[in-house]
Amino acid sequence: MSNVRYISNLTRETYALILAGGRGSRLHELTDWRAKPALYFGGKFRIIDFPLSNCINSGIRRVGVVTQYKSHSLIRHVMRGWGHFKKELGESVEILPASQRYSENWYQGTADAVFQNIDIIRHELPKYVMVLSGDHVYRMDYAGLLAAHAESGADMTVSCLEVPVAEAAGAFGVMEVDDDMRILGFEEKPQLPKHCPGNPEKCLASMGNYVFNTEFLFEQLKKDAQNAESDRDFGKDIIPSIIEKHKVFAYPFKSAFPNEQAYWRDVGTLDSFWLANMELLSPTPALNLYDAKWPIWTYQEQLPPAKFVFDDDDRRGMAVDSIISGGCIISGATVRRSVLFNEVRVCSYSVVEDSVVLPDVVVLRHCKIKNAIIDRGCIIPEGTVIGYNHDHDRAKGFRVSEKGITLVTRDMLGLPVGYE
């Protein structure tokens, strides 16, 4: 059997479950009205588009999206952008909100979110179940992970990557492996992570992406559901309980293409979210959104092209080293090193630099904005200065991050708020 046919069979026998119910509390007010997977990224996408696109580009066409926290905008986006699958061809992207199938509780943890959907998974009759994190921005060929799982004879395989020890502390599940990548130890979010052999600066962290043999997964979930002491979490409970008696392997994260650097970003803080967007402005970014070999799919709104108007000496509509999305109007203003999402309007004599501006923002005249994240629908009053003096920003009610990025939301401006 050819390798292509072998991989095709594996992906057809797989059901992917994307866990997209998290809030992302370290993003503060940016996720007050949306789940983290619904957060905007890269000028026109949402975070959920990346694991969904990875599934499609990897050949996995049966996907469930598990939702819970403030899920309205996430559900709306998935329905609009991912409803083109053909059920008659065995394709589907289904939304799986918490529905109290097995108890009166909502999803209590990552393992419980899967457990409460066992009946739906069983109906699909998959040989393998892939459980994926829905709140990271990354590009990954899941077919390689599936092939490694099948060839090793593992009961479970955990996708992993090397991260700095300081970065992993309290943030990631950390594992120990032998020379064959079999997992010998696993600790969820330790404060003192164990480093990789021979490299005290790095540790092996879980990406929150798992592959299970289906019946093995069901057995472990049912056993966990009967344990009153469990937190119902894969990292805290399931993995530590099975590594001694079962075959659990780690799979090193790698690029979807040879000779390319693998791309993965945890955009779980204001600083990391801002930086990951800024990285896209490089002439050769680590994440190439223009790569036709691995397209990122999303809901495509019907919008007019961006427009730049006025070319006078004292006001010139221009943008440099920036991403400007459809429907934007730069009217006698200057935009430098910034990411503007759709339908942003920047009015005359204003300057926006080194900033991420989400959809439907209006920046009125004579504003100066730098090192900022402006949330959707904000109307920045005329003459407002943001990002130049952190004390002044805080006095206005804006949030300033650890590394000096200023967040502005509608609520901070006294504007009505709601689901986005």
From Swiss-Prot:
Q: Per the record's keyword annotation, is Transferase included, yes or no?
A: yes
Its annotated function is as follows: Involved in the biosynthesis of ADP-glucose, a building block required for the elongation reactions to produce glycogen. Catalyzes the reaction between ATP and alpha-D-glucose 1-phosphate (G1P) to produce pyrophosphate and ADP-Glc.
The protein's organism comes out as: Shewanella oneidensis (strain ATCC 700550 / JCM 31522 / CIP 106686 / LMG 19005 / NCIMB 14063 / MR-1)
Q: What class of enzyme is it?
A: transferase
> What Gene Ontology molecular-function terms does this entry list?
ATP binding; glucose-1-phosphate adenylyltransferase activity
Q: How does it assemble?
A: Homotetramer.
EC number(s) reported in the record: 2.7.7.27
Q: State the CDD domains in the record.
A: ADP_Glucose_PP, LbH_G1P_AT_C
- Record keyword Cytoplasm present: no
Q: Which InterPro entries match?
A: ADP-Glc_PPase (IPR011831), ADP_Glu_pyroP_CS (IPR005836), GlgC_bac (IPR023049), GlmU/GlgC-like_hexapep (IPR056818), NTP_transferase_dom (IPR005835), Nucleotide-diphossugar_trans (IPR029044), Trimer_LpxA-like_sf (IPR011004)
Q: Where along the chain is alpha-D-glucose 1-phosphate bound?
A: 107, 173, 188-189, 206
The alphabetized UniProt keywords are: ATP-binding, Carbohydrate metabolism, Glycogen biosynthesis, Glycogen metabolism, Nucleotide-binding, Nucleotidyltransferase, Transferase
Please report which protein family the annotation says this sequence is part of: Belongs to the bacterial/plant glucose-1-phosphate adenylyltransferase family.
Q: Which reaction does it catalyse?
A: alpha-D-glucose 1-phosphate + ATP + H(+) = ADP-alpha-D-glucose + diphosphate
**Pathway where this protein functions:** Glycan biosynthesis; glycogen biosynthesis
Which GO terms of type biological process are on file?
glycogen biosynthetic process
Identify the stretch annotated as signal peptide in this record: none
Database matches in PROSITE patterns: ADP_GLC_PYROPHOSPH_1 (PS00808), ADP_GLC_PYROPHOSPH_2 (PS00809), ADP_GLC_PYROPHOSPH_3 (PS00810)
Q: Which protein, by its recorded name, is this?
A: Glucose-1-phosphate adenylyltransferase
